[in-house]
Structures are given as C-alpha cells and as structure tokens.
Amino acid sequence: MKTILSNQTVDIPENVEITLKGRTVIVKGPRGTLRRDFNHINVELSLLGKKKKRLRVDKWWGNRKELATVRTICSHVQNMIKGVTLGFRYKMRSVYAHFPINVVIQENGSLVEIRNFLGEKYIRRVRMRTGVACSVSQAQKDELILEGNDIELVSNSAALIQQATTVKNKDIRKFLDGIYVSEKGTVQQADE
C-alpha cells in the first residue's frame, strides 16, 4: 500500500540559519557550518514561514521503506543543528589489566598514538576524521576526549580508536584491554 503524502517538520532555533540547494542542506551556527547531501533520497525539502524557521520534508507516494527516510532526514538535520550550536563530545577510557596503555596525541589532536597495548612494541597510529579534535583529559586518568561538530565524524573517530585496540588470537572474555567509549555528550551545556 502506498501513502499519498508523508511529511515531517524540523524547528530551526534562532541562532541557526539553514539554506537549501536542491537536496543539499547547509546548516550555519555559532560553532561553524555543516553541509549534507541528500540527493540519493527522493524527497522534497522546503523551508516554511516568512522567517524560514522550519524545514519540511515531504515524500509523495512512498512505500514503507521510503517513508522511513522522512524521519531519518529530520534526525540528520536535528543532529546537524545540535552540532553547530552545542557540538559533540565523546569521552573514551583506557581499560587494562596489566600493561598500562600509553596514549600520545600528535599533530594538534589529529593523530592518536597508542603504545604498550598488551605490552606490544608496535605503535598503533589512528588518524582522526577532519574536524575532530582529540585531547587527553586533565581531570581523569586514562581518558581521551573527542570533540567536533559532526556527530558522524566524532563517533567514527571513536570507533577507529576502539577498533585499533582489538585483541587478536586471545579469549576476548578474559582479555578486556582496549579503549572504549565511556560517555557521549555535548561540548556546551544546553540551557534547559
């Protein structure tokens, strides 16, 4: 069964400006600019109102799979708005039983070097995605802080660090060493 029209709107805050170029969404805010291309999805994007403070996503004559993309695009745009206003911060903790993992940040926070993982001499180097800065926490021991405006790039960088410390040829129920995401949040606190 096909639904004639499915639509959803996203409210745009005062300090955020959104421009549409076809199906490319550009979000401008206090922390910077994000752009995302939705050309691969067949939907209509439009800005509503005189001040253009609402974004509407329309899908005509869609089946279940196609209708799901409407909410998906809205969620992506909401994440972009949150990114340019508050920013995203992921915290990661080093876990080790015996050999202390030594993490060094190089090149202004764009390269992470992991040494002494399970006592290995090999140095693991993980390059951060563009727009993601990594730093060692001053308040907490063995903690990394990843910050950026794009949630996909921040979470992807965290995944690259976690995957760099996978334990090979051992029972992973016993060898729990690695660097794992401990907390997900925003750089600035939202005013409730």
From Swiss-Prot:
One of its GO terms (cellular component) is presynapse. PANTHER family: 60S/50S RIBOSOMAL PROTEIN L6/L9, LARGE RIBOSOMAL SUBUNIT PROTEIN UL6. InterPro entries: Ribosomal_uL6-like, Ribosomal_uL6-like_a/b-dom_sf, Ribosomal_uL6_a/b-dom, Ribosomal_uL6_CS2. It is found in: Cytoplasm. GO terms for biological process: cytoplasmic translation; translation; translation at postsynapse; translation at presynapse. GO terms for molecular function: rRNA binding; structural constituent of ribosome. Keywords: Acetylation, Cytoplasm, Ribonucleoprotein, Ribosomal protein, Tumor antigen. Gene3D superfamilies: Ribosomal protein L6, alpha-beta domain. The modification N6-acetyllysine is found at residue 121. It comes from the Eukaryota. This is Large ribosomal subunit protein uL6. Component of the large ribosomal subunit. Signal peptide: none annotated. Belongs to the universal ribosomal protein uL6 family. Component of the large ribosomal subunit. The ribosome is a large ribonucleoprotein complex responsible for the synthesis of proteins in the cell. Pfam families: Ribosomal_L6.
